[in-house]
């Protein structure tokens, strides 16, 4: 069986592709740049042809929130690119798995279900939602598609907005928390998402749109306190009053702080998911999300100079 993985140089694919190959699948990695697991170099915003037969396509390639590229670049990759990959899936009659994002919901009340109203905030969420709508168009014409709305994906090797927190932990500096820190903020261990993608190979769920938000976590205060202990740091949590959120959003817009307006709209609220539909597929989470953050902190400390650039 042949599986095409787009975004083969990306974070999720780096864990997914070796597992697929170990299980005996023929894997075609596709990315716009060369990489360890990339066999086809191609800009997915352009028409795509693959000579090989393809049974499953796992579409991971996307411009991400923290890349802060132009709206046009977001649309070219996340919307036009998704349609090009769907065209390929249609020509191969391949089962298509689209990894979308829980950011399509905006910042609603928790727990969030698949019936929660969609309200995408920002170019990333909007373009991923548009990608979902294109998937539905192909699904209506008979293509087998599963849409996974994933929460933030964390694990060893990824730092993103957390590298500032990790540096503060290393320097025994304050850990800033927006609001009182009693809110629960959900995220996904990368290995859980990888295992679910592999699970879908034997347990196809065409027509399913499902949230994949990770186990319901502890509060932000509890999570950061665990990291302080794990990192043997003398850092302390400092709470930032919500009255200053307007200033933080301005600083984010000016790219002075390493977060986006969407991050600021959710990080002080409960943001977690009802897992009933996911569990009905037969899959259960296998990894503790806090361990993903601990792995990231370990990675940061072991690769400090390199990590600063990631």
Model-identified regions with their sequence ranges:
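Conserved Rossmann-fold NAD(P)-dependent oxidoreductase catalytic core, especially the SDR/UDP-sugar
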Residues: 84-123, 146
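Mid/C-terminal beta-alpha module of Rossmann-like enzyme folds, strongest
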Residues: 199-259, 294-297, 303-310
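NAD(P)H-binding glycine-rich loop region in Rossmannoid oxidoreductase-like domains
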Residues: 44-80, 84, 88-90, 105
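Glycine-rich Rossmann NAD(P)(H)-binding loop
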Residues: 155, 177-183, 210-218, 228-232, ...
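Conserved C-terminal active-site "lid" loop/helix of NAD(P)H-dependent oxidoreductases
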Residues: 190, 249-284
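Active-site Tyr-X1-5-Lys
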Residues: 119-146
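Substrate-positioning beta->alpha
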Residues: 158-164, 178-201, 207-208
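N-terminal Rossmann NAD(P)H-binding glycine-rich loop of SDR-like oxidoreductase domains
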Residues: 3-23
């Amino acid at each position: 069986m042949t599986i095409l993985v787009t975004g083969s140089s990306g974070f999720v694919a780096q864990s997914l592709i070796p597992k697929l190959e170990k299980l005996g699948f023929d894997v075609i990695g596709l990315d716009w740049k060369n990489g360890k697991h990339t066999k086809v170099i191609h800009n997915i915003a352009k028409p795509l042809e693959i000579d090989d037969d393809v049974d499953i396509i796992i579409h991971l390639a996307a411009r991400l929130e923290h890349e802060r590229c132009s709206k046009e670049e977001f649309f070219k990759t996340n919307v036009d690119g998704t349609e090009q990959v769907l065209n390929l899936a249609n020509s191969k009659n391949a089962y298509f798995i689209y990894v979308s994002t829980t950011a399509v919901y905006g910042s609603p009340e928790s727990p969030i279900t698949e019936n929660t109203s969609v309200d995408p905030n920002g170019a990333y969420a909007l373009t991923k939602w548009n990608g979902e709508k294109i998937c539905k168009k192909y699904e209506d014409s008979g293509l087998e598609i599963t849409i996974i709305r994933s929460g933030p994906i964390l694990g060893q090797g990824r730092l993103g907005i957390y590298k500032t927190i990790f540096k503060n932990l290393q320097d025994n500096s304050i850990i800033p928390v927006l609001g009182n820190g009693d809110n629960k903020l959900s995220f996904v261990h990368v290995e859980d998402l990888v295992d679910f993608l592999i699970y879908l190979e034997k347990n196809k769920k065409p027509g399913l749109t499902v949230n994949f938000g990770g186990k319901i976590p502890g509060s932000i205060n509890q999570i950061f306190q665990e990291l302080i202990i794990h990192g043997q740091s003398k850092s302390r949590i400092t709470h930032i009053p919500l009255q200053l959120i307007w200033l933080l959003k301005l600083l984010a817009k000016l790219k002075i702080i390493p977060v986006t307006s969407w991050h600021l709209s959710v990080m002080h609220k409960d943001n977690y998911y009802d897992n009933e539909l996911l569990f009905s597929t037969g899959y259960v989470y296998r990894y503790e999300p806090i361990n993903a953050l601990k792995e990231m902190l370990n990675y940061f400390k072991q690769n400090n100079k390199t990590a600063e650039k990631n």
